[in-house]
Amino acid sequence: LCAHAGVPLSQGRVFTAHTQDDRVETFYMRSIVGTGPGGFRSMTYRNGCICRPLLDESRQNLRDYLMVRRDSGRSVCADKSGNLWREDETNECLDYFRNYVRQEIVPRAVEKNPKLLVTLCRTMNLLADEDDYLSQCADTLYEEHVSWLSALPGREPEYDAGCVLSPSLGQEAPVMQRRVVMRVLQEMLGFDERVETASVQAICQAFEQGKPVSGYVTNLQGDLAVSANKQGV
């Protein structure tokens, strides 16, 4: 489509039909397996080229809308059997984690709060706003406290060469230390790699009472090594 329209691939957008239900299911899934504060925002309205314009609507509302369009004679997309949406044959199998959450956990939560979808999505939006703000603060601290060893003016650093965290990072609030360290590790490991909580904690432990712990050494995921002295971590 981008080639047909004569625009760069980076300007392309993929629109999905994810709904409130999908977002709530993802929230419970992450609650069960564990996640960071940002993970509790669940699905985002936009992530790169992926856009999710229906996150404020329930799955049932979307289905009702399609049926109203069909019944009123307006254009809809349907398969040869007239189905307006496709049900995956595995949806009823509780061996799949999402299906278990969808069939067992969410319905019971809805019994306690019939407005669960609206309530929980509103909560996730509040979490997202605060997460965005903290991320902006962390970006500022990242620029202040992180020095890449291979950094050259006008060029992207060679992240695998390592970096130094300034001694003064230890004086920042622990939540901001973790966010800066998380970004550093993501840069070094690559954005396809999941940063382990233990790795973040191991680096933060190199600071104590607002300064680096001289002589501290440890190893992390991805064969990364950490050491600390009065010059930094």
Mark where each language-model region is.
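Structural element of the ATP-grasp superfamily
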Residues: L1-C2, L62-L66, V181
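Short intrinsically disordered, low-complexity coil segments enriched in acidic
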Residues: L1-L9, R13, M188, A228-K230
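Active-site catalytic microenvironments for nucleophilic, acid-base chemistry
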Residues: H4, R30, R108, V184-M188
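Solvent-exposed amphipathic alpha-helical surface segments
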Residues: A5, R69, G73, K112, ...
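Catalytic subdomain that performs nucleotidyl-dependent activation
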Residues: P8-A17, D21-L127, S135, E143, ...
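AMP-forming adenylation/ATP pyrophosphatase catalytic core
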Residues: Y45, C121-V233
